[in-house]
Amino acid sequence: MREINNFLMLSSVAAMFVAAPFAAMAQSEEKSFPSAEKIEYVVEVKDSETPAQLTNVKDLYDNAPGVFTFRGTSRRDMPQSGTLKARPSGIKRVWTFQTAFDGRQTSHGTWGGGSGWTGQPLYVEWPDSLMERQRKESTGLTANFSKREVIVGSLSGDVYFIDYESGRASRKSHKSGNPIKGTLSLDPRLNGNLYIGQGIPASQPFGAEVFNLFSHKRTSFFGMDAQAWRRWGAYDPSPVVVDNFVLRLSENGTIYKLTASEKSVKTHSLMRFRHRGSKAYGMESSPAVWGKYLYFSDNIGNILCVDIETLKPVWHYDNRDDSDATVVIAEEEGGVYLYSSSAVDKQGDSGYSRFVKLNALTGELVWENKIACKKIQYCEKAREGGMFSTPLLGHGDCEGLIFTNMCGMGSDKGSFVAIDRASGKVVYKKHLQFYAWSSPVALYTPDKQMFVVTGDVIGNLYLIEAKTGNIIYTLKGGNNFESSPVVIDNCIVVGSRGREIHKFEIY
């Protein structure tokens, strides 16, 4: 994993953006664009003693020993990629871990176990000093605790800790109390804080929590926010840490800026917003960060850039429909850009998934590809069309491309799509056996050939040659891969609906 990460860092245009511009940005005067005037908002400061300014805007996840948040970094660009010795030919199962099963009936159905959308596992390679500390302090370790650990939230309402090598429990599970749909986030400052968001209220209290791995205890719980502009208190977004702050988004339509230590978490400030003339909507996608700016999309299609220091909107873009896929930030020749696309939800049975590339600093549209999609009938329900998968940037022999899964694009199933990042044009699309919400991950050979693994909702895993879209191998590997995988070495770890977390080898 380290070898390919070094290649990506060297080959990326990110090398052009040295520390000085980031520092200048952090100290720049507050600025907003006319598009931000479309947003009605309030900012509430809860802690006036702690300065709101950022002292460092580097991406803390770039040097984290593993994959600590959804899509790896605060840019959500998934630079953590697998390594292959040669062109791969197949996928095989290494181990399967069984979760509990939650049979409670909720107002939103029964959720069972395993993992759902987005449900990406985290991965950590513990430094020796923290291995020793945890062996001394933690009451939750098992005999299988080791240096390489997988952490995943389950629809059963539990958080599981798994030894990467053996697939056995590395710690006692943590009972969160309600189904967890989204992706957890581990603090890259290595203070042991694990940020957990509950997704479905099977019981009360319902909300978000912080669990500390060193003490193996819950240190904070945040329940329903009575002042929120939306009365749905789920926390599917994966929090992100910037400097000394934790940024947590909620489906209640609020951005929370927190300060967190090993023993306590406090709200520093918060921002509530809505499009003028509209009701408030929530966020299921995870926030991205570049410099001192926070980026995200919501359930009606608002794409916002917010100043992290002030929590005031900088710019707004209307993408016209529910946008559940997480935005991706990319540093390219000519600037910093944001990629996003929408679902087909509010439009009716058919419409467009609007895949857009925006100037991340101004919100100006670079290009838009209106991809015709439709809702899909499955299990007597209409499933939304469009994009739920978070896009993957191409590197190596696929530099200049971006990949994603689309639902209902020209068929009742799903499509794996490659798009040219310069023009927005579809380079190719390959039909999958069914629709896919899972986000693709990349693996590279020594000569920088890119291969992709992605899953669909009937349990297929696809091994794809990224340059051509050729599907090399398909494995029926689970019940339903809504969850996104994490890639480690030449393997992936991914959960499925039901009761399973799997490790697969790409060979």
Predicted region positions:
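Bacterial N-terminal signal peptides that target proteins for export
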Residues: 1-12
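Bacterial N-terminal signal peptides
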Residues: 11-21
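Signal peptide processing junction and immediate N-terminal pro/mature segment
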Residues: 22-28
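Aromatic (tryptophan-biased) beta-strands that constitute blades/sheets of beta-rich domains
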Residues: 28-123, 128-144, 148-149, 166-178, ...
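Repeat-blade elements of multi-bladed beta-propeller folds
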Residues: 67, 116-154, 158, 179-208, ...
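Terminal-region recognition feature
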Residues: 76, 157-160
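Short loop/turn segments that connect beta-strands within beta-propeller blades
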Residues: 163-167, 212-216, 259-263, 307-311, ...
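C-terminal structural cap/anchor segments
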Residues: 418-430, 436-437, 441
